[in-house]
């Protein structure tokens, strides 16, 4: 069982959930992916998940921190609707502090408007 678990977790790849400008609504194109995350959490009852909200650099730091919180919370609500208990989730709100690309281009900003995940 340990080997099966290890293999399943090794094969699973987290992808960011991206958001529109000033948006915190999760696009329906992510539904299947988020259900897959929930299936893995359900099949490994000791796993927990960290949900990490991020924004681009537009707007004030305070505004972006709040927006990253809203993005993280939207994901949390989806996981709850799919049967994941809140005590298995940790939320982190980075605002604009951890960009993965430049905030000087539209493409870079798009990549920074995201929620990342990790198992813990």
Regions found by a protein language model. Give the residues of each.
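Periplasmic peptidoglycan-binding/tethering modules of Gram-negative envelope proteins
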Residues: 1-48
């Amino acid at each position: 069982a340990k080997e099966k678990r290890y293999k399943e977790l090794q094969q699973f790849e987290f992808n960011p959930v991206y958001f529109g400008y000033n948006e915190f609504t999760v696009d329906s194109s992510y539904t299947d992916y988020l259900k897959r995350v929930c299936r893995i959490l359900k099949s490994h009852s000791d796993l927990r998940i960290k949900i990490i909200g991020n924004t681009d650099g537009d707007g004030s730091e305070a505004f972006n921190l709040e927006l990253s919180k809203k993005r993280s919370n939207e994901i949390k609500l989806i996981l709850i609707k799919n049967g994941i208990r809140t005590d298995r989730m940790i939320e982190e709100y980075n605002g604009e502090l951890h960009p993965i690309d430049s905030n000087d281009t539209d493409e870079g900003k798009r990549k920074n408007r995201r929620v990342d995940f990790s198992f813990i």
